[in-house]
Design a protein with these regions (language model features):
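Long, contiguous binding/interaction regions
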Residues: 1-184
């Protein structure tokens, strides 16, 4: 087990404490409950549609990952078994250094730093398996997701309309996170 694939307890910017861990095959029901707890706007921003529930085939695919070409992490509060956030990548078969990215944070947990924590951990895991770029299709109105992407590394975007196509270089740290060392 590599460092980025081990469970990790994280204190969020809000002070909340969660455990980040890899998705397990038995997580399907918990993922379904998490989806059921998403508001309509969050569902639309993540899936570009508002389904009342995720289809069984989608849940099965979401819980059965190989942790190499398809990785998924979840966030679980220490005092609860329920999933409050999830992120994943799926490697592009024709571009082995690139993977499609997705992230979901329950409405009640948005704005606490959970999305940033999940994506930082997922980026570590991606780099371990040779992925240096994430791609994502994001609604142009979803400024919080675009900001999360910018926090991962340099972002190239194209916007043919209401959907922004983004490519993030996760191997290159973002400029705003670089530390400056001063010597006197």
């Amino acid at each position: 087990m590599t460092a980025a694939s081990r469970p990790q307890v994280v204190t969020l910017r809000s002070g909340d404490v969660v455990r980040l861990r890899q998705v397990r095959p038995g997580d399907g029901p918990a993922l379904a409950r998490a989806y059921a707890n998403l508001g309509e706007q969050s569902r639309y921003r993540r899936f570009f549609t508002v389904m009342p529930e995720l289809p069984e085939a989608t849940l099965k695919q979401a819980a059965e990952v190989d942790h190499e070409d398809h990785e998924a992490l979840v966030a679980v509060p220490l005092l609860s078994p329920e999933i409050v956030g999830e992120c994943r990548f799926v490697r592009w078969p024709d571009q082995p250094d690139t993977a499609e990215l997705g992230v979901t944070v329950l409405d009640a947990w948005q704005g606490r730093g959970l999305g940033s924590a999940l994506l930082a951990r997922l980026s570590e895991r991606a780099l371990e398996v040779g992925i240096g770029y994430f791609t994502a299709e994001v609604l142009a109105e979803n400024r919080s997701m675009l900001a999360l992407l910018a926090g991962l590394g340099p972002v190239e975007t194209s916007s043919p309309g209401p959907v922004v196509s983004a490519r993030v270089d996760i191997a290159e740290p973002p400029r705003q996170r670089r530390r400056i060392s001063w010597t006197c």
